[in-house]
């Protein structure tokens, strides 16, 4: 959950080990308690027996896509909220994985939100009464999808979302980092 608060020590550790500026340079974020990497690091530090059992690390919508298609996948918007993802180079960060004790094989293949990650598994198609040719898309994180839904897609467009969390999206045609982050 984004409201998870147990990971404050892990966030401080990541911000110190990598450095806020360096972390922000490739993730466009600082370490925040709601992100996946601090949660995984917390598990490593506090529940090592469960940490050792991790097969795949995925977010809820990605688990649903896996159950529908049998493929491990995520999209760029959700990957960017894990802190394992190098947003600038659009790949998993070897450095962050190493620091957290995660193997890249434990992370899903990353797609653009609109890309197809697979089609329905035969048993799922049959259960749902749908053809096996139904495509499963990578999808998007909630705020990223909301930004697109509100038309925040042109360079310099802004979307402010206030709810369980507060998010400000400013669309850009290039990678940019908030120097005050």
What are these regions (language model features)?
Residues 1-181:
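Glycine-rich phosphate-binding/catalytic subdomain of phosphoryl-transfer
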């Amino acid at each position: 959950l984004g409201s998870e608060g147990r990971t404050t020590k892990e966030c401080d550790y990541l911000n110190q080990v990598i450095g806020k500026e360096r972390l922000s340079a490739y993730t466009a974020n600082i370490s925040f308690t709601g992100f996946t990497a601090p949660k995984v690091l917390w598990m490593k530090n506090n529940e090592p027996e469960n940490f050792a059992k991790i097969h795949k690390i995925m977010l809820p919508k990605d688990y649903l896509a896996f159950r529908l298609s049998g493929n491990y996948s995520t999209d760029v918007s959700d990957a960017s909220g894990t802190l394992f993802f190098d947003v600038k180079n659009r790949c998993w960060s070897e450095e962050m994985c190493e620091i957290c004790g995660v193997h890249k094989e434990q992370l899903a293949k990353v797609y653009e939100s609109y890309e197809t990650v697979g089609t329905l598994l035969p048993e799922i198609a049959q259960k749902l009464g749908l053809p096996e040719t139904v495509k499963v898309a990578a999808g998007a994180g909630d705020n990223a999808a909301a930004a697109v839904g509100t038309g925040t897609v042109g360079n310099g467009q802004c979307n402010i979302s206030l709810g369980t969390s507060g998010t400000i999206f400013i669309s850009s045609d290039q990678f940019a980092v908030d120097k005050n982050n």
